[in-house]
């Protein structure tokens, strides 16, 4: 017997439905008071571990505990507390063909429900479910309101049109689908991205075909916004990501990633330290702000407008993209194959493609300017730690980090200085004069070295075919590598300062090869002449 308010309730046998039902003490069985009806061995009934089929919880009634199995139904217009639901999904997730489960009807409330394997809780319009735990493949279908639902181990929540989920927590392998017209607020997503950034995985995490507001995406969490979906005020931490095919507004990247695909739109995105926004071909972003150590990447065919690039923020793009905004130099743009006033630092990069141009480019520490064969960049300003990638088929002019002018054009490279990470390729028939390599890579595919070519600590000179040196190749303090091909002509190779010059699989035909200081390591080398200038210098 169950007491609620001032009324007693009993389980009585319904001869019409052939099942036990909850009844008031005033209810009659075949014209008799309920006290007579309970003579049907009530003790045996209450010892059963499951509720009877088709239990009805009427308005103002409260039922505590119980288990639904084997296509049992519980229809709740009152309150059901602590029920375990293990039936209702036998025919597949969110299928109308299913029978059984717990039905929270208009005005009804389900509290502290546990939905397990094959279990289903249906919250109809006007119904409310709170503090539900869904696990092991169980599901919750919402046309009403669900508050503080937890999805564990393949637990699923389907928010239909008119339904609302507030405060859902999606743990490992959990899955929330917000369908068109559905709303989810305050969701915490802890799963979906275990396979890595933007891996093909749609079996866990949050899928948005309706509206998602104030979602928090933690490590391993993923939110996928379908073309019909919209997300607002999303917070994404490191290891979490958001895939946008629809709309994303006011997203904050605190180390997390946002990928905007063809047809997708992102507005008012804030990229903080280690955050990364990627605009793919056909994707669009507006009003993105890049703060220090944040990164905006706009791929070929992508578009980002009204970008604010603050000091220390990184822009990664090419002249095949469209990007406009402001940086510390003022307004900048990359439009129709022309880039102007771009700042590259902290992982920023600009690729200038063949037939395209860049003007007034600033390349500071951690920034990279890549000018492809047939591309042109003028008024380039290289700062300390800036990286230049080019070959002798490009056209480049500007100043080095030490303030000296350099240029590439017409098959002639003058006064290049290649910092660590930089690379220059000298094509056959072209000439490089007075090149300095400070930890970068200088590749000569034939051509001629003129003036003084200097290799400093960490530098590599790679030869392919025959390269002519009629002047001086000097290796100063530190270690350097000369490898491959052949170096011919009437020039000289000079090693000075401490460190080791490694010469590997290279044929040297020079007027002189002088090891004045340090060490030289030879591997499969033919040398016309070698002279050791002092007793401290030696071959190894």
Name the predicted role of every residue range.
Residues 42-44, 48-540:
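Beta-strand-rich extracellular passenger or scaffold domains
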């Amino acid at each position: 017997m169950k007491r609620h308010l001032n009324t007693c309730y009993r389980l009585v046998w319904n001869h019409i439905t052939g099942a036990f039902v909850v009844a008031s003490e005033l209810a009659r069985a075949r014209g008799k008071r309920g006290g007579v009806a309970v003579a049907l061995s009530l003790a045996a009934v209450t010892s059963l571990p499951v509720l009877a089929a088709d239990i009805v919880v009427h308005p103002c009634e409260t039922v505590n505990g119980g288990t639904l199995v084997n296509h049992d139904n519980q229809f709740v217009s009152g309150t059901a507390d602590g029920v375990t639901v293990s039936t209702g999904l036998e025919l597949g997730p969110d299928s109308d063909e299913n029978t059984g489960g717990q039905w929270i009807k208009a005005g009804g409330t389900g509290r502290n429900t546990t939905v397990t394997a094959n279990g289903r809780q249906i919250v109809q319009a006007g119904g409310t479910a709170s503090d539900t735990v869904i696990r092991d493949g169980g599901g919750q279908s919402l046309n009403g309101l669900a508050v503080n639902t937890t999805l564990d181990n393949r637990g699923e929540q389907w928010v239909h049109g008119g339904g609302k989920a507030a405060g859902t927590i999606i743990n490992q392998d959990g899955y929330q689908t917000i369908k068109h017209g559905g709303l989810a607020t305050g969701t915490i997503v802890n799963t979906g991205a275990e396979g890595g950034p933007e891996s093909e995985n749609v079996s866990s995490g949050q899928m948005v075909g309706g509206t998602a507001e104030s979602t928090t995406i933690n490590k391993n969490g993923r939110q996928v916004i379908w073309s019909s979906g919209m997300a607002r005020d999303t917070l994404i931490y490191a290891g979490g990501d958001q895939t946008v095919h629809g709309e994303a507004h006011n997203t904050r990247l605190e180390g997390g990633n946002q990928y905007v695909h063809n047809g997708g739109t992102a507005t008012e995105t804030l990229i903080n330290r280690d955050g990364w926004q990627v605009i793919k071909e056909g994707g669009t972003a507006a009003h993105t702000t890049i703060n220090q150590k944040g990164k905006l990447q706009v791929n070929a065919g992508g578009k980002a407008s009204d970008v604010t690039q603050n000091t220390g923020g990184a822009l990664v793009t090419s002249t095949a993209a469209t990007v406009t905004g402001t940086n510390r130099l003022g307004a900048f743009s990359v439009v129709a194959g022309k880039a102007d006033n771009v700042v590259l630092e902290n992982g920023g990069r600009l690729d200038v493609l063949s037939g395209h141009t860049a003007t007034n480019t600033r390349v500071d520490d951690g920034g990279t300017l890549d000018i492809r064969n047939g591309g042109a960049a003028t008024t380039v300003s290289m700062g300390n730690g800036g990286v230049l990638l080019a070959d002798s088929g490009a056209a480049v002019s500007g100043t080095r980090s030490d303030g000296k002018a350099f240029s590439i054009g017409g098959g002639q490279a003058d006064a290049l200085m290649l910092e660590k990470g930089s690379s220059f390729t000298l094509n056959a028939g072209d000439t490089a004069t007075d090149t300095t390599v400070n930890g970068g890579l200088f590749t000569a595919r034939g051509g001629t070295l003129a003036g003084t070519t200097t290799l400093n600590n960490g530098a590599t000179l790679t030869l392919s075919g025959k390269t002519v040196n009629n002047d001086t190749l000097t290796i100063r303090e530190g270690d350097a590598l000369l490898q491959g091909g052949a170096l011919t002509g009437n020039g000289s190779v000079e090693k000075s300062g401490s460190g080791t010059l490694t010469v590997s699989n290279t044929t040297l035909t020079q007027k002189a090869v002088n090891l004045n200081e340090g060490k030289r390591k030879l591997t499969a080398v033919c040398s016309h002449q070698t002279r050791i200038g002092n007793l401290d210098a030696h071959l190894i």
